[in-house]
Amino acid sequence: MTNPIYDCVINKKTTQKPIWFMRQAGRYLPEFRKIRKLNPNFINLCLNKNLSAEITLQPLKRFDLSAAIIFSDILMVPYGLHQNVSFKKNFGPALGDISLDNLLNIKKEEFITKLKPIYNCIKKVKSNKIMKNKNLIGFVGAPWTLLVYMINKKSPKNKISNNFFDNKNLINGILNKLEEFLKIHIENQINNGADVIQIFDSWAGLIDKKDLANYAYLPTLNLVNFIKSKNVPVICFPRGIKNYKEYSEFVKPDAISIDYKVDPHKIKKEIKIPVQGGLNPNILLSDKETIKKEALNYLNLFK
């Protein structure tokens, strides 16, 4: 099979730019909304091999995309570590209390067993004929972002609590455990068919400049090196990070994702690796010609 993302980010061949959406499977598709209505428990939906595979493939049945993104969630890792995780309407993720002692005693086999349906889903998607000459993107949350959810027990929105760093033993213990089990989760995704891994650091923008190395750069660098050792491309999305140039030079992903609040001209000047994303999603509410014009302008900017 051809490998459009690998060719782009590793071999630096750009004759065919790979195209996919960051939130590819989801509410904009009526076929997804139909499944979601019948399956209100989001965690159970992620653990349903057949339904999650169907959702993963839905966008590719409509659009000629270069890749499928496995239908899952970054919070499946805390779930695998026996933290209660649920998604509440008009609230978002809600996580239960966490005990470091309990966390330290979790065995690799327990974790893999809890997340086995995800790996089976990857295998099922990969074997589908639609995936011929398509990539399959697996993903994880960065250690910092998962730490924020696990301690904060909900979405931090735009800030973390003043006492977040009070218990350094808890923070360091969770980070160490997360690195260990994120590698397990990544390896199982790769072994079952993921061609690319993306690391989402959704709350990187909440880290003070003085703490970036300890909480954003180093933990993610360890994962990046692990993924590269498997000869698999890795894309990082440090949303809101204060210095994309410093991040890309320290963490060394194969490609980097940006959001629409970032100045693309600055990114083009400073970043020397492939860039994904950055187009304002509000453009999709415009007419067809405007969407086409904006997309082409954005592509031409990075030529």
Regions inferred by a protein language model and the residue ranges of each:
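N-terminal basic, low-complexity leaders that serve as flexible interaction/assembly modules and, when applicable
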Residues: M1-H82, S86-F87, N222, N300
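Hydrophobic faces of well-ordered beta-strands that scaffold small-molecule active sites
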Residues: T15-R23, A67-I70, L136-V140, I197-I199, ...
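Active-site mouth loops of central-metabolism enzymes
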Residues: L38-L51, K157-I184, N280-T290
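Glycine-rich, proline-tolerant flexible connector loops at the mouths of alpha/beta enzymes
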Residues: I69-K89, D97, L104-F111, V140, ...
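Active-site-proximal, glycine-rich beta->alpha crossover segments in alpha/beta enzymes
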Residues: S86-N188
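Alpha/beta enzyme core
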Residues: N152-I199, W203-P233, K245-D254, L296, ...
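Catalytic-face loop-and-helix region of soluble metabolic enzyme cores
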Residues: S229-K303
